[in-house]
């Protein structure tokens, strides 16, 4: 529908076959001024103001003048941009798309993914940097300190790959818009999309930290050592790595906190689930153990080097350079080579019997030297042993450490104890916070149950009522898990609320026969107004004679519906309601009546739950609206469905059929009595008029007997007909339910 033509930022739309151009007024920028300047030169008028066809003679001069004018305008435009003139803010994502350079929205999914990957790369970076401390090792055979070349190549390669993520992140920072602080009064705020302002802000905030973090100083030191063969470089490399890695570790570690805070501010949360948050802090604790283990390894090697240096200082055949591998060709090394093993084992022993005083106290580093990890090139065993030592002493706050009097060792132990205390408190606190979010609903339910028990005990409720309250609370918890679904949905926008209600209720509503054949519009209206209800076993939904304030549609469970026709003696009707049935249909008749007042109708039945019941409820006011939609259905199908499933209509139909059947039986019996009477009359007449040879006395007695028989027949017939008529009238007393108004007329 939209395409771009002419200057940048101007869109065109085809309306009724005509192309109409329009420009967003709130997106006007100085960029569009430049584009408009360029577009002006393409119009039919030249700079001198005359028509183009009259200026052909001075085409060369006017062209040069226009070129200079355009360059001057571009210069003024760039100066204005540099001092901040013009509008450089945007609110909507489409404003970012029309910019000349790609500017990312801080809440863009791609940028959020990149930030999460960068946090992961930061964690990997601070995990890789301590591996540089494992490069020095002790050659136990040559009694010298060397550099593990294979491990050095692997570590520097991994560090370089991770630094590439830093460079990519720094490039993204120059193209990521930010919310202007002055626009945070209401809503999201305005995004600053000017690349100059974005770059200025980044340079003033985190650029220096990122630059110090990404400097490849450790790689340069390691590769310089690998490409030189002089053994004296071992000492310089070891000292440089120790200081540079530790110094550069500070900005790398500090960069993680503002980045995670930025993720929480833009994405709302950093860890999507409670388990992810707990695992994140556990990972940080393991990272601290990894750092402590690497420092312990390096300090153990340094402490061993101090002992060797002290022993070498007391021996005239030794110089300090002999203690580092690669110096075998130095002058005087042969004399030292003959005595170094026995001499160093004598002066710096690591396996000393307990009853003897060692010549040199290694303190907390004795375990690293006696285990042989400082002289091993097996990185896996070396790494996990140091990791376990760091985790063990961080968790125990260094309680099992036996230090020497060496100040550096004591300071390291004190720092270890303080760091362990802080990290352990941080880990426990944050893990408790995250894990409590899993059980907060359960705890709220326990508090409510305790309050309910105290209240019932205070009010001295009978045991059966207490049991019903407990059963209802338990059933509601099992169904909702303590979540107030209604309030949760009500806080959402209307269209989203409608879609959620449709997703949750549509399939269940279609199972109700009354709603089965309705159109989508009516079903949406019904779903939007339905409210879920829960009823426990043996609870009464409505009682006969009470006002009906809602119509219930059964989703699960079984109910009993009973009526006595207003308490009339001798009348009792019972039926069962199951999934798909409804009750409270008196309210639908009331809602469809155009002359109904504000008084709610009375219930004609008592409805009791036989099992736990789930239902949807339509209250009276909402049903008024839905019922008004029913009248627009130009079909009798809904009316027939309503009659078929309505308990009122079913009861009336049953009584009506019983009355019709009894009337039929009455007519049959009356017909039979009439035939018997006719037969007896015919027999009596034949006796009288038959000319019998009996005497006149016998004839008189026969006529008298026939008259008495006819009188008894008439009496019995009258009594039976009166009884049948009275029973029929009793059945007909059950009035026909009022007819709902399903017409299409509005009222």
From Swiss-Prot:
Regions of this protein lying in the Extracellular compartment: 139-150, 227-239, 302-407
Membrane in keyword set: yes
GO cellular component terms, semicolon-separated: cell periphery; plasma membrane; root hair
Compartments in which it is found: Cell membrane
Ranges for region Calmodulin-binding: 630-645
Membrane topology (Cytoplasmic): 1-117, 172-205, 261-280, 429-747
SMART domains recorded: cNMP (SM00100)
Family statement drawn from the similarity comment of this UniProt entry: Belongs to the cyclic nucleotide-gated cation channel (TC 1.A.1.5) family.
Record function comment: Probable cyclic nucleotide-gated ion channel.
PANTHER family: CYCLIC NUCLEOTIDE-GATED ION CHANNEL 15-RELATED-RELATED (PTHR45651), CYCLIC NUCLEOTIDE-GATED ION CHANNEL 6-RELATED (PTHR45651:SF42)
Protein name according to UniProt: Probable cyclic nucleotide-gated ion channel 6
